[in-house]
Amino acid sequence: MEKLISVAVMRASDAAEIAGGTDSKTLMYRAGLGLFQSWNWHGRIDIVTGSGNNAGDGYVLALLLHQHGIPCRIVRTTEKNSPDGGYFFLKCEERGISVTDSIDFSHTDIIVDCLLGTGFRGELRPAMRQIVEQINQSGASVLSVDINSGMNGDSGEGFCVRSDRTVSIGCLKYGHLLGMAQGKIDSLYNYDIGIPCKGSYLPLFSGDTGAPENWDF
């Protein structure tokens, strides 16, 4: 049984887990592993990143793809990183994973949307809206990390990336399933990274955390 919670509850649960002794980079690794396991990876893969922890999840995914001999490209929209995201980005650079700041999806088969997380509120800035429009018009398959970039995690409102699949991290958020998210998420998958969350229950298929914890790439 899945839990359906607010963004604030997820954030507090995440903070409590870290305060209790779980390494935040371990949680980020688990999230990236959930992404890796949730898709049939093939063709040209672009991992489009912003500045937050969603980007860090994408960097872990890039490392796992590289580890399994699957080429990918990181498309950075900013040079800023969260502390944990920066750690995994340096690992990507050390391994020679392709990195670009050019937004061109004309030959892309799969786009991984790691731009904005569940904390986003309000309207997209013009530059970010343009990137979202380019993703939506690309014709590529799209996987969104935790929430579709631009979507309000509590209400489902907002101009946002349209995904073929969204992989929620930890627990489902209200915004994933409210009516305003209709037409924006084609399929929804939740990956449990081992954070206890308080909330109402909803039946939905979920991944698990049964994989090894070794993220020393």
Task: Please provide the spans of the model-predicted regions.
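YjeF_N-associated NAD(P)HX repair module
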Residues: 2-5, 17, 110-217
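Nucleotide and nucleotide-moiety/phosphate-recognizing core
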Residues: 36-115, 123-145
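An N-terminal, well-structured beta->alpha segment
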Residues: 1-48, 216-217
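Electropositive phosphate-/nucleotide-binding environments in soluble metabolic enzymes
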Residues: 4-7, 21, 25-33, 55, ...
